[in-house]
């Protein structure tokens, strides 16, 4: 790892989960931004690293790639995410292949889509009954229905929040109190299982974006405490969803629970328009000092 200043992004998604760019696309964009420390953290997938192993993508010189993953978890029936850094790709790939076969992923996404259709039918929303989810990608059932609902202006007139993918997902689709709630958690690991497999793969576990879930400060700290009890070593400090004061509050929690910190944009490409690699909405910067206590001790990949 080179000395001096660094340009860092430790959270991004590719076509191997719910992003829109390939591994090589991401590498090209990171090169253009002079990024030199980064991690591909697809949901429940290490496909980017397999692309590199197969020669389907190539690292450029002078960079440090931290092997990573974002594991989707269930906490009391709510979707929560755990990041793993410095993982063994073969160990994590074996776990993911056994837990999430393509057949199982397709079956789950189609079931989620059918449940979403049922809700929208009850709301007299307009959509094509023939749409399907047949690729097994993360959140595919949700995304297919979101795109279809937005093809019909009358749906947006009735429920304006339907045209905001992030708001619809977190405030309604995954919110048990919402009439648009669909349970996605029925086959997901707990925090404990996620941390255990990250550790088994030789990595370190970080609770992802603690403030993205719309919780109060007290509830957010409760969630962080659950992650700590499960064995997590760190938390994601910098993230595009943070509002004013969040970083300071997260820093206080990190000190209180003796947690390492990480940061990244959570870049998804066209699925989250406006969010750019490295800087998110243009004003985010992950400082090397925020990751230096741990980044040198985990497995990394270089050209």
Feature map (PLM): residue ranges:
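An N-terminally biased module of ancient metal coordination in phosphate/nucleic-acid-related enzymes
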Residues: 1-79, 175, 181-272, 298
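Extended substrate/RNA-proximal surfaces in nucleic-acid metabolism proteins
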Residues: 58-221, 286-290
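His/Asp/Glu-enriched, well-ordered alpha-helical/loop segment
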Residues: 232, 273-303
């Amino acid at each position: 790892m080179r000395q001096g200043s660094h340009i860092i992004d430790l959270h991004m998604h590719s076509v191997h989960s719910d992003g829109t760019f390939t591994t090589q696309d991401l590498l090209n964009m990171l090169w253009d931004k002079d990024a030199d420390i980064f991690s591909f953290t697809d949901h429940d997938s290490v496909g980017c690293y397999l692309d590199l192993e197969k020669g389907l993508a190539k690292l450029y010189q002078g960079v440090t790639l931290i092997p990573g993953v974002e594991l989707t978890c269930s906490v009391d029936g709510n979707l929560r995410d755990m990041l793993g850094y410095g993982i063994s790709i073969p160990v994590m790939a074996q776990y993911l292949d056994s837990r999430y076969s393509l057949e199982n992923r397709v079956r789950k996404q189609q079931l989620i889509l059918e449940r979403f259709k049922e809700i929208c039918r009850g709301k007299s929303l307009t959509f094509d009954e023939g749409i399907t989810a047949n690729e097994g990608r993360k959140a595919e059932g949700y995304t297919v229905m979101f795109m279809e609902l937005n093809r019909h202006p009358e749906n947006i007139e009735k429920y304006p929040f339907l045209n905001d993918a992030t708001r619809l997902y977190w405030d309604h689709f995954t919110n048990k109190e919402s009439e648009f709630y669909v349970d996605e958690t029925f086959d997901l690991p707990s925090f404990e299982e996620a941390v255990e497999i990250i550790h088994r793969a030789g990595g370190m576990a970080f609770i992802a974006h603690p403030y993205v879930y719309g919780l109060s400060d007290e509830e957010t700290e409760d969630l962080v405490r659950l992650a700590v009890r499960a064995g997590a070593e760190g938390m994601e400090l910098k993230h595009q969803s943070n509002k004013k004061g969040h970083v300071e509050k997260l820093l206080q929690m990190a000190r209180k629970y003796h947690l390492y910190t990480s940061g990244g944009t959570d870049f998804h490409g066209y699925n989250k328009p406006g969010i750019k690699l490295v800087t998110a909405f243009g004003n985010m910067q992950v400082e090397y000092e925020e990751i230096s206590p741990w980044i040198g001790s985990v497995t990394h990949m270089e050209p």
